[in-house]
């Protein structure tokens, strides 16, 4: 579900998963690991 997907992103990034559909695959914009 969309909630489970958001929870997965939250666990991966340790920060708020919004907008999770935009940040997915490119965390560099959020200062992340740049997948």
From Swiss-Prot:
The cofactors named for this UniProt entry are:
Ca(2+)
Q: Which domain of life is it from?
A: Eukaryota
Query: Which GO biological process categories is it annotated with?
Result: arachidonate secretion; lipid catabolic process; phospholipid metabolic process
Tell whether Coiled coil is among the UniProt keywords.
no
Q: Which InterPro entries match?
A: PLipase_A2 (IPR001211), PLipase_A2_dom (IPR016090), PLipase_A2_dom_sf (IPR036444)
Sorted alphabetically, the keyword list is: Blood coagulation cascade inhibiting toxin, Calcium, Disulfide bond, Hemostasis impairing toxin, Hydrolase, Lipid degradation, Lipid metabolism, Metal-binding, Myotoxin, Secreted, Toxin
Predominantly, its location class is secreted
Q: How is it modified after translation?
A: Contains 7 disulfide bonds.
Tissue specificity comment: Expressed by the venom gland.
Localization, per the record, is:
Secreted
Catalytically driven reaction(s): a 1,2-diacyl-sn-glycero-3-phosphocholine + H2O = a 1-acyl-sn-glycero-3-phosphocholine + a fatty acid + H(+)
Please state the Enzyme Commission number of this protein. Answer: 3.1.1.4
Q: What class of enzyme is it?
A: hydrolase
Cofactor binding: number and manner: Binds 1 Ca(2+) ion.
A cellular component term (GO) from this record? extracellular region
Residues that, per the record, bind Ca(2+) = 27, 29, 31
As one GO molecular function, the record gives: calcium ion binding
Lipid metabolism is among the record's keywords? yes
Q: Quaternary state and partners of this protein?
A: Dimer.
Q: What else is on record for this protein?
A: Has a pI of approximately 7.8 and about 121 amino acids.
Say which family it is in. Belongs to the phospholipase A2 family. Group II subfamily. D49 sub-subfamily.
Protein task: Snake venom phospholipase A2 (PLA2). In vitro, shows anticoagulant activity and induces cytotoxicity when tested on C2C12 myoblasts/myotubes. In vivo, when tested on mice, induces myotoxicity (intramuscular injection), edema (injection in the subplantar region) and lethality. The catalytic and anticoagulant activities of BnpTX-II are lower than those of BnpTX-I. PLA2 catalyzes the calcium-dependent hydrolysis of the 2-acyl groups in 3-sn-phosphoglycerides.
Mind telling me what this protein is named?
A: Basic phospholipase A2 BnpTX-2
